[in-house]
Amino acid sequence: MNVRMFSLMVGIFSVLNTTQFFIFDLNQKTHICYEAKFSIYVDSKSELVTWTLFHRANISTGLSLTTIIIGCFLFYCIHKNIYMGLLIYAMWIITYELINFSIVLLLNGIIKDHFKTLSYLHWIFQISHMLLHFFCLPFIVKHAYNLYKESQTVGRKRRHRLCSTIAVNS
């Protein structure tokens, strides 16, 4: 298998994996009982934590949909041999995982003691998600580097051919 094929597999993996974790995030229960609205989180005095908890579904939706779109953009860039698109994908995955890690870190601090085992599940999901994404990044970067080197070689040949044509016409 060549680096291009690995990059395509990374794109497929990224879209499917992001979709899977997006579904997990949307189906996560934070309240139990309909009348009492018993929350698994304690009340926090931090505005950032409260805002993150309140807008978690919107943040997850925005990040996941952006990642899926950028994953599809990765397919296009691999097909058209655009190395800059592969680098954009790599930078986005790093940003995406750091934001998700920050959210898990913030929200695990306010989980009630009765639900602490749930925080371990959050950590396992987050760390496995990060490891899987970060394991794939070297293949993307290597393919981008190969495309960059290839474009430099083609540029030199084109300049050499253009200079030869101008010299013959003179």
Curated annotation (Swiss-Prot):
Coiled-coil intervals: none
Regions crossing the membrane: 59-79, 86-106, 121-141
Record localization: Membrane
Keywords attached to this entry: Membrane, Signal, Transmembrane, Transmembrane helix
GO cellular component, one term: membrane
Cytoplasmic side: 80-85, 142-170
Signal peptide: 1-21
Membrane topology field: Multi-pass membrane protein
Misc: Found in the 3'UTR of TMEM217/ AC Q8N7C4. Cotranscriptional with TMEM217 and seems to be only ever transcribed from the same promoter region.
Name assigned to this protein: Transmembrane protein 217B
Gene: TMEM217B
